[in-house]
């Protein structure tokens, strides 16, 4: 029996009433994963034994009636550390790495008696927008298996969209939660920088990375964020802000709210069908009582260039730790210490990772630091100031999550610039450290289209409020791909 059409609250009621046990739910989830895995390839590791052991222990202890997450399976992106479960970052460099500790986000999930069911596929070290740079496999879009799921958290998005799991965790450095959420027709949120601890997240761009939730609905997404968020002494960038319940504003009306629609987000390079969908969504918000007005974010056009200088520079520093000495892959044919470093990194990293290491090393070099890295930091400040000016007068910003719907496999992975431009609408949010959500807003040629809502720092409750108002008065989130029993 499958329970993948049940909401978290419905599953909780079944568990509390003992209509099902945690072991039965875990076994059913494992069956859902296996039944769909060959078609979509969401997972790198399926933690059958560990998950069933945890579920049995929970049944012995008893389900907490006051904890809606007790016994709920959770898929985790494979760059988030899980003690005793392979954590590869989808790289040959870490193909055999088992952490001896849990990431704080995972530890928080365990504290709520959630069950880690497996580790999801991703772009190698989270560097990519299609989940095609993984060392292990290419994940497929849940709606069309000839298309990409987005990236870098493609496995986490597809696992939810295809009905393998109800909840998953991803990470977002330049759009890596929101873009795959849009491509797969699910809800994905990138929290405020510092709202969720980065401890245990394998670092890509340390000033940009954030762990965040995927779910089929806005409420379930907010429920998962309530579990993983919070201040953490182990992360020096963790914010001293504690919000106990991110669902608190869901269900409240949005009459009188002012929502900005940047003209740059619907300009050149945006698929006309995407633009049409977003404008229709804006009209829908007006019917709900919100005030929609056009604004300008003039420096957003520089976001991609700024991001790839800053992110690559930070990556070139972060990835220095992977040298074949302490853990992970080591080249077998090395004859000296220098040989170990050179051959291990040459053989262990994929092409996209090596490209970004070289770009970052160049940007940080003494002759080019001022011209590139320093200048990028200055433009980043201008992008932040653009957002601050808008949020002085508006509650949220509305726009598309991605300029197109999901593209075909093997079309952009050989064109780095085109792939980078696919993140043009999500990148500015990371540069400014803001929260943003992608929710299903319609379809273009049978493929899901994502609507992005951006808020000022620590406005996740308001973002969820507005997103839920849209969701409650539309049915896009209810439509499912054929692999999940839908008719598309």
Swiss-Prot record:
Catalytic activity: L-glutamyl-tRNA(Gln) + L-glutamine + ATP + H2O = L-glutaminyl-tRNA(Gln) + L-glutamate + ADP + phosphate + H(+)
Quaternary structure and interacting proteins, as annotated: Heterotrimer of A, B and C subunits.
Pfam families: Amidase
Disulphide bridges, residue numbers: none
Function (record text): Allows the formation of correctly charged Gln-tRNA(Gln) through the transamidation of misacylated Glu-tRNA(Gln) in organisms which lack glutaminyl-tRNA synthetase. The reaction takes place in the presence of glutamine and ATP through an activated gamma-phospho-Glu-tRNA(Gln).
GO process annotations (BP): translation
Catalytic activity, EC: 6.3.5.7
Gene Ontology cellular-component terms listed: glutamyl-tRNA(Gln) amidotransferase complex
A GO term, aspect molecular function: ATP binding
Top EC class, one word: ligase
Keyword field: ATP-binding, Ligase, Nucleotide-binding, Protein biosynthesis
Family indicated by similarity: Belongs to the amidase family. GatA subfamily.
UniProt keyword Ligase present: yes
Active-site residue numbers: 77 (charge relay system), 152 (charge relay system), 176 (acyl-ester intermediate)
Protein name: Glutamyl-tRNA(Gln) amidotransferase subunit A
Organism of origin: Streptococcus equi subsp. zooepidemicus (strain H70)
